[in-house]
Amino acid sequence: MFKENTIKLGIAPIAWTNDDMPELGAENTFEQCISEMALAGFNGSEVGNKYPRNTVVLKKSLELRNLEIASAWFSAFLTTKPLEETVQAFIKHRDFLHDMGAKVIVVSEQGHSIQGLMDVPLFKNKPVFTEEEWEKLADGLHHLGKLAQEKGLHIVYHHHMGTGVQTTAEIEKLMDMTDPELVSLLFDTGHLVFSGEEPLYILKKYLSRIKHVHLKDIRQEVVDAVKESDLSFLQAVKNGAFTVPGDGVIVFDEVFTILANSDYKGWFVVEAEQDPALANPFEYALKARKFIQEKAGL
């Protein structure tokens, strides 16, 4: 289905230890995490809180297991803080990823975000940017995009639950306001379906701008309960809203077909944060790997 040597398969460490709720999977070590990733058949990963920031140490640990770094999340605060604060943190992040050989930087605007707040209802309190904030976001992303390109990297914007860029209309507005040469898109199946969007619409419309893919599935009954009970994003994660591809309600066949018939070249990263005490990370990594092999031939 996919052309040879176009796709690398990664998996996110958030299934082993949750970055937002470090008590979930606190017992899982960095070495266990990356060893199980390799054993499950993945080529690389994104970066978690337990990963060493010393690139010499990190490279050695990964090379022993034939793993690479695909990318790492960056929290921008372009709508709420002075640009220089985000820029300083971004340059450090960019240089780390460049040293690790990554080609994309995952960026998410966290100004007004409620994704990390345990008791704030996800759907009732979703932030909405003002026009002035949209302008700050677009201008700031252009700045970050230029900084990334100085080192041969691209920024990929992560639409995300509980943030100001979550819905179809918000993704479209961001894409309309930004330069395709400077700002690319991260396509995340799980966040789109969770929000009630149509992922194939976004995939088809912005195919040429998508430079990174997160594969995650949704347990619809949990999403329904989140809406009915006014739960937060973190409560949704703890209750199992997300799972690995093939374990929920999302149909991935057309997603894979569209991407296979496109010029997409890069990473598919399985990112399915759930409580590792309830969903053994190694077991679910194996499930995901088997599903991708069966459905995408990868």
From Swiss-Prot:
Top-level division of the source organism's lineage: Bacteria
Pathway listed: Polyol metabolism; myo-inositol degradation into acetyl-CoA; acetyl-CoA from myo-inositol: step 2/7
Pfam families in the cross-refs: AP_endonuc_2 (PF01261)
Cofactor dependency: glutathione; Co(2+); Mn(2+)
InterPro entries linked: IolE, IolE/MocC, IolE/XylAMocC-like, Xyl_isomerase-like_sf, Xyl_isomerase-like_TIM-brl
UniProtKB keywords: Cobalt, Lyase, Manganese, Plasmid
EC category name: lyase
Gene3D superfamilies listed in its UniProt record: Divalent-metal-dependent TIM barrel enzymes
Catalytic activity annotation: scyllo-inosose = 3D-3,5/4-trihydroxycyclohexane-1,2-dione + H2O
Example GO BP: inositol catabolic process
EC number, UniProt record: 4.2.1.44
MF (Gene Ontology): manganese ion binding; myo-inosose-2 dehydratase activity
Family: Belongs to the IolE/MocC family.
Protein name: Inosose dehydratase 2
Protein's organism: Bacillus cereus (strain ZK / E33L)
Upper classification of the organism: Bacteria, Bacillati, Bacillota, Bacilli, Bacillales
